[in-house]
Amino acid sequence: MGRGRVEMKRIENKINRQVTFSKRRAGLLKKAHEISILCDAEVSLIVFSHKGKLFEYSSESCMEKVLERYERYSYAEKQLKAPDSHVNAQTNWSMEYSRLKAKIELWERNQRHYLGEDLESISIKELQNLEQQLDTSLKHIRSRKVCK
């Protein structure tokens, strides 16, 4: 006996909606991990809950590298498709604004992580990278203190 198809509409019951979100998010993250392993693909996934909580997965050690690569790729694609120079210039400024805004948001997120905030939304791999970065910074600070 198989499951029936679920009608694609918003789930009205708040508790059922949250349970469904959690289960489907976990399934989506698992699928992203599986495709990265099985197909040796570079996979990144970003999910925001209805409350704005961030959930992410990256097969690379650093989501920032993947996002920068995506920005470069999409920028190059748009350059090839924009024939009008005026429109092209406007698009360049718009894209640059979007790119810088995303970079600022990323830096703010990283700063919160360095301060120990919003750590529940990041993966174990990212926590290990954060720990390594903080250890490196502490070593650098201690070595500078010894020199003075």
UniProtKB/Swiss-Prot annotation:
SUPFAM superfamilies: SRF-like. GO terms for biological process: cell differentiation; flower development; positive regulation of transcription by RNA polymerase II. Homodimer capable of binding to CArG-box sequences. Its main location: nucleus. PANTHER family: SERUM RESPONSE FACTOR HOMOLOG. The gene is CAL-D. It holds the Pfam family SRF-TF. Probable transcription factor that promotes early floral meristem identity in synergy with APETALA1, FRUITFULL and LEAFY. Is required subsequently for the transition of an inflorescence meristem into a floral meristem. Seems to be partially redundant to the function of APETALA1. This is Truncated transcription factor CAULIFLOWER D. One of its GO terms (cellular component) is nucleus. GO terms for molecular function: DNA-binding transcription factor activity; protein dimerization activity; RNA polymerase II transcription regulatory region sequence-specific DNA binding. InterPro entries: MADS-box/MEF2_TF (IPR050142), MEF2-like_N (IPR033896), TF_Kbox (IPR002487), TF_MADSbox (IPR002100), TF_MADSbox_sf (IPR036879). Residues 90-148 form the K-box domain. Keywords: Activator, Coiled coil, Developmental protein, Differentiation, DNA-binding, Flowering, Nucleus, Transcription, Transcription regulation. Residues 1-61 form the MADS-box domain. It is found in: Nucleus. The keyword Cytoplasm does not apply. It comes from the Eukaryota. This is a truncated version of CAULIFLOWER that may contribute to the 'cauliflower'-shaped floral meristem (curd). This trait has likely been selected by early farmers during the domestication of modified inflorescence structures.
